Amino acid sequence: MLILGIETSCDDTGIAIVEAPDKKGAFKILSNIISSQIKTHAPFGGVVPNLAARDHLKNIEPCLKQTLEKANLKLSNIDLIAVTIGPGLIPSLLIGVNFAKALAYKYKKPIIDINHIEAHIAAALTSSKRGISNFQFLISKTLFPVIALVVSGGHTQLVLVKNLGKYKIIGETRDDAAGECFDKVAKLLRLGYPGGPAISKKATKFRPKADQPRAGNFQLPRPMINHKNYDFSFSGLKTAVLYTLKDMKKINVPEMCAEVQQAIIDVLIAKTLRAAKEYKAKTIILAGGVAANSELRKQFKSQISNLKSQILFLVPPKNLCVDNGAMIAMAGYLNQNKSTKNYNKIKADANLRIS
């Protein structure tokens, strides 16, 4: 089966073709093209919805052409079209949804609507150490239940995955997502956009003295880390950074970046591990754009390996953490029984929930 995946939920235009050749679940990514809009949004320090939609409209056809050329295929070869319908920015979503519907109608192909959050989870479930170009996986019932942390610029959610297609959100951000907090702090520090990679890079340059804690001269709050629920809140952390910077005579940017990053990591890991214990999870998934953060991945792996109970840790390759068409295609395969040729049923939903 050849699946075309289309992703336009935010500011990345992603189109991919994934081959699922047998019932055992062996996947091969034939092509995975991503057109970034960083240059468009960098002057604003964040994504501007109307500009994002404009760039999607400009980029989507060239992306499709590149995807087909790299895979050496034609649209007539495609068996299923999968497209993100939400959650996300409605102007962006509409570009991808309408484009996918037009292709499905023209080439008489079945189409399936995909939840963006579920696709991030699918990317972790279907990934392996082989990486992006050619990898295999086998989804086993022994993986479940799963606790999935999906964390990006627009989302921070803890999801209980009871089985494929059975999801329950047990916690989410009440204000800023973790990735959004990175972006806003980076703007305060004039590090540019996107903020996550910039802060991560600067943080590696901080070297605390032997007699100092990691935080060095100051320590930022860990918002809601001890709350009994699994919700998150990162707007207060950004505010704490603002006031700390005002009080500092000399700003040590690497030190601030290291502390901001560690504060976010501490909260994300603490909540996830507590949820895994309560729900007796057999697997923990880390997914979404922020999952590409090397320090977050390292500390997650370390803390999970130190647990008394054996829990499998799954995280996609870094190039599958960002928004991409491959994860949409893989989610499409896992949900192929829901595909339709009634194209009017496929509608964008900016506030779509996974449960």
Model-identified regions with their sequence ranges:
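Short Gly/Ser/Thr- and charged-rich N-terminal loops/segments
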Residues: K23-G25, G131-S133, F137-I139, R207-A215, ...
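Glycine-rich beta-strand-to-loop/alpha-helix junction loops that act as flexible
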Residues: V83-P87, L103, S152, I285-N293
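A contiguous, well-structured pocket-lining segment that forms one wall/lid of small-molecule binding clefts
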Residues: N32, K201-F206, G216-I284, N293-Q303, ...
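Conserved phosphate-binding catalytic cores of ATP/NTP-utilizing and phosphoryl-transfer enzymes
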Residues: I114-V146, A331
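Conserved phosphate-binding/catalytic loops in two-lobed NTP-binding clefts
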Residues: D113-I114, I284, Q310-I328
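Glycine-rich phosphate-binding loop plus the immediately following alpha-helix
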Residues: K162-T204, T239, Y243-K249
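Short beta-strand scaffold segments in enzyme catalytic cores
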Residues: T13-E19, A148, T156-L160
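N-terminal beta-alpha supersecondary unit
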Residues: L2-P87, L94, H116, H120
